[in-house]
Amino acid sequence: MNTLSEHYGLLLGPDRSWRVVDVDLSLEEKRVEIRLEHVPGTPVCCPECAGQRPLKDHAPQRQWRHLDTMQFETILTARVPRTECPDCGVKTIEVPWAEPHGRFTLMFEAFAVRLLQAASSIEKARVHLKLSWQSVQRIMDRAVERGLITRELEEVKHVGLDEKSFGKGQDYVSVMTDIDGSRVLEVAPGRDETAADVLWNIFSWEQKEGIEAVAMDMWQAYVNSVDSHVPDAEVVHDRFHIAKHLNEAVDQVRRAEHKSLMQEKDETLKGTRSLWLYNLENLSEQKRAEFELLKEAELKTSRAWAIREQFRWFWDCRSAEEAEVFFEEWYLWASGCGLKPVQKVAKMIHKRIENILSWFRHRISNAAAEGFNSIIQSLKSAARGFRNFANDRTRILFFCGKLKLLPESASH
């Protein structure tokens, strides 16, 4: 029959250079402590140059959190040998059960990563793991570091640039996505040209040459950054942002007209905001019937809505050439409508039309980036005060980056 030390030695599976020498079970603390020892006489190698070197001494005792044993917290302890390398100096050797400077075993980190990915919230995973927020953050930091090292960017052809409100007041982050891969590539604080420049640093010059198009809002800072880093890529102004601008114009007209009507005790537009902003197909039959009567009224809001609706057909054109003809006719109507919010958006689109017509060549948008919004907002609200940009970035890449997060030797 195996002794307890031999039993744990088989379960842990350390290489032959290490052995379990003692197992301490505390029923009161619900804790198992496993003491490992480097087998005397076993060769040691410098972790820097991998050369076999003489043993100098042993570092002070360290401990690592391991997978629980029958729901008992399990800790590995060891004094790790140090080598004396003529080239690299005195170095502590690597251990087979944990990464350098880690406080958790590879198996525990792999379990924690899988649990974080599967749990509905970081807090629930943290409670189950019986860890502090700081410890969970360190595990996520290390997982993202591993994932970024092995991430492949050679096949990225279509990139999205978008801004997200991610803090109090007017705090923003800039987010870069791989549109075809539906993943977040990088996050930078701010939404200016400097922030966008930081995002491009993840690519080599060879990888940048492979990027064909970039989807974004009509934000000049992002356009400038694209021109600097990927001058051969086409800018594609995102159709969903354009729709947002047109919606805002309709709403501005409605609010101004509603205020004017209410001064005359006319409540025609009261409570109608959603009717003007929703697509007809998303309205209930009752609401659609109400709206059919409303939009036939002699209202400025009706005209603004009609202009917005007409632009939706722009995206159904079969080519950029056909779309350009369509736009010129639409622009004559929109620019001459006498509704300042609509005219302002029409002029903005006219100014950027070349980067809008490019959609017909690439047909990309930031729809995937918009899909990450709910995840990013939930991460923001769940941080419980343990927030700074570095932590925010880690969490976004952890959950939205499609990275290989598991330790290599524990990923099976």
Each PLM stretch: what is its role?
Residues 34, 125, 349:
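A residue-level signal for conserved active-site and pocket-lining positions in enzyme catalytic cores
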Residues 1-90:
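Short, conserved DNA-binding cores of transcription-related domains
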Residues 1-33, 37-41, 107, 113-115, ...:
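Long C-terminal interaction/binding lobes of large macromolecular proteins
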Residues 10, 74, 93-95, 164, ...:
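Flexible, active-site-adjacent loop/turn segments at secondary-structure boundaries
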Residues 18, 64-67, 96-100, 133, ...:
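Tryptophan-centered motif/residue detector
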Residues 43, 48, 54, 168-171, ...:
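Acidic/histidine-rich catalytic cores and adjacent linkers
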Residues 50-170, 209, 356-357:
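Short, positively charged, Gly/Tyr-enriched micro-motifs
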